[in-house]
Regions:
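Solvent-exposed serine/threonine-rich low-complexity stretches and specific carbohydrate-binding patches
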Residues: 37-45
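Short proline/glycine-enriched turn/loop motifs at strand-loop junctions of beta-rich domains
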Residues: 20-24, 58
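Short edge beta-strand/loop segments characteristic of extracellular beta-sandwich folds
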Residues: 10-19
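Beta-strand signatures of extracellular beta-sandwich domains
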Residues: 26-30
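Transition segment at domain starts
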Residues: 1-9
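Short, glycine-anchored, charge-dense loop/turn motifs used at functional sites
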Residues: 31-35, 63
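Short, surface-exposed loop/turn motifs with a glycine/proline- and acidic-biased composition
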Residues: 44-66
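C-terminal tail/sorting-segment detector
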Residues: 64-82
């Protein structure tokens, strides 16, 4: 099934767009050692709703971004900063 999330970078900002309303979502970014470097919660109530996450102060390396909602939905992605 299609995942209702897309993510793009513009400079040092990661833009996450939800392509369908999914309710309350917890967002976490973890570094390569599983340390949580970012957390946020938001209520996604509209098509195309976005969040902008600055990664300006992150070290170079690989990160995992995780999304969880109250209906036991879970999806993750990986990105690398140079």
């Amino acid at each position: 099934p299609e995942v209702p999330i897309s993510a793009t970078f513009e400079g040092n900002v990661l833009y996450v767009e939800f392509t369908t309303p999914v309710g309350n979502v917890d967002i976490a970014i973890k570094d390569a050692t599983q340390n949580v470097v970012y957390t946020s919660s938001m209520d996604v109530t509209a098509f195309g709703q976005q969040v902008a996450i600055s990664v300006e102060n992150y070290q170079a390396g690989t990160y995992i971004i995780e999304f969880r909602n109250s209906k036991d939905g879970y999806v993750y992605g990986e990105f690398t900063l140079m």
